[in-house]
Amino acid sequence: MTIAKSVLLFILAAVAEIGGAWLVWQAVREGRAWWWAGLGIIALGLYGFVATLQPDAHFGRILAAYGGVFVAGSLVWGMVFDGFRPDRWDVIGSVICLVGVAVIMFAPRGTTS
């Protein structure tokens, strides 16, 4: 259950952070209304809160692992919302990042982690 909870929280954090950044991008770079940026700022704040819900107690570990989720999630977001098509190097790089996430978060550790 802890792995499932971590994965769900990482996905939720990615939606909040990537979605928030995308909303700000839409306002600033694509000329959308200012309130798009406001919603983006709220979503980015929500991301910061969601990260605190991870079962692991170590800030550095959580944020380092989330970085890999962010890389892969950003490519998926771009595909869904902007028509971006990643090349094989984008895909290979994101898979490497996700393997890193699994090692950082779920490798067996002693009690002194």
Swiss-Prot record:
The lineage of its organism: Bacteria, Bacillati, Actinomycetota, Actinomycetes, Micrococcales. InterPro entries: UPF0060. Coiled coil: none annotated. Signal peptide: none annotated. The chain crosses the membrane at residues 7-27, 33-53, 62-82, 91-111. It comes from Arthrobacter sp. (strain FB24). It is found in: Cell membrane. It comes from the Bacteria. Belongs to the UPF0060 family. This is UPF0060 membrane protein Arth_4423.
